[in-house]
Amino acid sequence: MKWDKRVVALILAVMIVCPLFAAPAHAQEQSILDKLVVLPSGEYNHSEAAAMKQRLEKIPTSILDALYSKGVKIKLTQGAITNEPELAYLKGVVPRGWEGTGLTWDDVPGVSERVVAVRIGYSEKGKGHNSLNLEIHETLHAVDRLVLNEVSGTDEFINIFNKEASVKYKGDGYVSAYPTEYFAEAASLYLYSDATRSDLKDSMPLTYEFMAKLFAN
């Protein structure tokens, strides 16, 4: 009988202790990013790559799961994105909206195809791009195309684009010119931080409401 009591006590102890070691939501999110993100095989800035992964956590886990189910990979590259085998066809090609700059895809730090490729150390605005955050912006292009069925091309979003894209991006020839770019940048503002979300709400309220409905599901 004493042995039975010990067994019961042990089982109870295990039941109490185990929840303490259950994987938190943060760990689950890291897990899907470990599946999505491909790191360079050679030398690279480990701390910056880790920071990029951490920023990608701002994208809802359900959306990251959907990207993974579509076979998407997010490659963090040490060198030019066109050095990646999947993107070699872009060498020497001028990106849309970059005409007359003298630059090609070899100079651009990020792209979103079936593979999302972003250069390590180029996350911030002004480092070869004008996005709030490079890795989030490029990943959200893939979300738009592959998870949200090109929601940036719907009549509802085009109408919002026509009304509000010029509020912050007038004359930039890029975000204000292409609904896909406006979507990726506006969605970045919505997801990046409380401050950027508040700014989106104040300056582009129709866009904010669209994003709020979109990411509520």
From Swiss-Prot:
Binds 1 zinc ion per subunit. Keywords: Hydrolase, Metal-binding, Metalloprotease, Protease, Secreted, Signal, Zinc. The keyword Cytoplasm does not apply. GO terms for biological process: proteolysis. GO terms for molecular function: metal ion binding; metallopeptidase activity. Its cofactor is Zn(2+). PROSITE patterns: ATLF (PS51995). One of its GO terms (cellular component) is extracellular region. This is Pro-Pro endopeptidase. It comes from Paenibacillus alvei (strain ATCC 6344 / DSM 29 / NBRC 3343 / NCIMB 9371 / NCTC 6352). The lineage of its organism: Bacteria, Bacillati, Bacillota, Bacilli, Bacillales.
